[in-house]
């Protein structure tokens, strides 16, 4: 079995972390070192690349993960943008069946189906546990005494 590679923590050089745990460690160490975290920035190509803010542009120009991310962008040209705040849910639905432009005098003949990609953009994320806890806080609690 091959020994696992270790990375050095950018927040504390005394920390040597296995590569498989490095991202978790970065999040933990960032919280424990807020002063140093304010001076550091995360690479947009790899979240495990944390460098001083003044070196970020230089790092991103030569980042080894840069080409992989740029290739994904060219292979997948579909861009999804969130709906604007002006749009509301009552907008008119697009017909799933558009008539062929060649046939204009016959209703519903040779109908071509249109693929519509619907995306979910939550306005507020609420966990099931949060709602249970808030219900417990608002409901009066019954005090149990021995012998009841």
Swiss-Prot record:
Binding annotation for Zn(2+) 2: 43, 49, 59, 63
Zn finger intervals (CHHC U11-48K-type): 6-33, 40-67
Nucleotidyltransferase recorded as keyword: no
Region Disordered, residue ranges: 67-99
InterPro entries per UniProt: TRM13/UPF0224_CHHC_Znf_dom (IPR022776), UPF0224_FAM112_RNA_Proc (IPR051591), Znf_C2H2_sf (IPR036236)
Biased composition annotated in UniProt, kind: Polar residues: 82-95
GO MF term list: protein-containing complex binding; zinc ion binding
Protein residues bound to Zn(2+) 1: 9, 15, 25, 29
Keywords: Metal-binding, Repeat, Zinc, Zinc-finger
Pfam family, one: zf-U11-48K
Family label: Belongs to the UPF0224 (FAM112) family.
Protein name as annotated: Gametocyte-specific factor 1-like
Native organism: Homo sapiens
